[in-house]
Curated annotation (Swiss-Prot):
GO terms for molecular function: anthranilate phosphoribosyltransferase activity; magnesium ion binding. Catalyzes the transfer of the phosphoribosyl group of 5-phosphorylribose-1-pyrophosphate (PRPP) to anthranilate to yield N-(5'-phosphoribosyl)-anthranilate (PRA). This is Anthranilate phosphoribosyltransferase. It comes from Vibrio vulnificus (strain YJ016). Keywords: Amino-acid biosynthesis, Aromatic amino acid biosynthesis, Glycosyltransferase, Magnesium, Metal-binding, Transferase, Tryptophan biosynthesis. It is an enzyme of class 2 (transferase). The lineage of its organism: Bacteria, Pseudomonadati, Pseudomonadota, Gammaproteobacteria, Vibrionales.
Length: 332
């Protein structure tokens, strides 16, 4: 371990194996907190490489509680958070809409770090059981098409890093690991990142982790596909990363100001999402969710973004996605 940490002091990058070893020690609670802070700081200042991120993610997955992985194609749709814009819960809402469009989604999430209402805060407000067993969660993905894995239930070892992270009060590699350590191990993923500098490295990380098809996005300041500006995309297809830019027009929607999709506290967000999923959403809110669902549908082989967007809007207006929220609340 000393050799690994000394390497970081010299601002040298770790191999994937070394990073996995370092994070295995952290997750088991075997690394002194002062050394942990030093290692996290050194990684942050140097800039984490895809090898280092993949190694850390593999360590966390290896130490996670097991989950009965489906043998069919299924996805996660998730953002790193931390973009500082406090929009409505787009990826959580999109998970239900995607399921109503026929996709399978096992969404990994946590309590809110920086926004007023994280995905679990919202699900809580709908009466969805965040402590559902792995078996019940898996059966929800099978039968309803969507379920939610609450991070602390599967990644108990992350608690060893919490005091250090809270004291450091700055972003570390842990801020980008969440979306990469879904214990269900989906083979398809749409992941939003808080900075465009992360788009390519995270796509390279996903490639190293064996993701079948995925897209990493940053939308003009948001960790989602944007309707207020351009979205930078790095898409993994057939083992190759394709980078491109999408505009609202590519989805057949109008451009809307960021203000139009502002969120609030969990109760306000619950009201907004209920409206959205029962045909009473605003054009901007519907578009914001639909463009994210549309890109996720592309990852399942439905290539026409405009048709996908329209299908997602129709599903929201029909109330079909809201029925899935109710089903999941009754599931366990």
């Amino acid at each position: 371990m000393e050799a690994i940490i000394n390497k970081l002091y010299l601002q040298e990058s770790l191999t994937e194996q070394e990073s996995q070893q370092l994070f295995d020690t952290i997750i088991r609670g075997e690394l002194d907190p002062i050394l942990m802070a030093s290692a996290l700081t050194a990684l942050k200042i140097k800039g984490e490489t895809p090898d280092e991120i993949a190694g850390a993610a593999k360590a966390l997955l290896a130490n996670a509680q097991p989950f009965p992985r489906p043998d069919y194609d299924f996805a996660d749709i998730v953002g790193t958070g931390g973009d500082g814009h406090n929009t409505i819960n787009i990826s959580t809402t999109a998970a239900f809409v995607a399921a109503a469009c026929g996709l399978k989604v096992a969404k990994h999430g946590n309590r809110s770090v920086s926004s007023k209402s994280g995905s679990s805060d919202l699900l809580d407000s709908f009466g969805i059981n965040l402590a559902m067993s792995a078996e019940d969660t898996r059966s929800a993905v099978d039968s309803i098409g969507v379920a939610f894995l609450f991070a602390p239930q599967y990644h108990s070892g992350v608690k060893h890093a919490m005091p250090v992270r809270q004291t450091m009060k700055t972003r570390t590699i842990f801020n980008i690991l969440g979306p990469l350590i879904n214990p269900a191990r989906p083979n398809i993923e749409l992941m939003g990142v808080y900075s465009q500098e992360l788009v390519r490295p995270i796509a390279e990380t996903m490639l190293k982790m064996g993701m079948k098809r995925a897209a990493v996005v940053h939308g003009s300041g948001l960790d989602e596909v944007a309707i207020h500006g351009d979205t930078l995309v790095a898409e993994i297809k057939d083992g190759v990363i394709h980078e491109y830019t999408l505009t609202p027009a590519d989805f057949g929607v109008n451009t809307h100001p960021l203000e139009a999709i502002k969120g609030g506290d969990p109760e306000e967000n619950k009201a907004i999402i209920t409206h959205l999923l029962t045909g009473k959403g605003t054009e901007a809110q519907l578009s914001a969710v639909a463009v994210n669902v549309a890109l996720l549908m592309r990852l399942f082989g439905h290539e026409d973004l405009k048709a996908n967007t329209q299908q997602a809007i129709d599903v929201m207006n029909s109330g079909k996605a809201y029925q899935l929220v109710e089903k999941l609340a009754q599931h366990a």
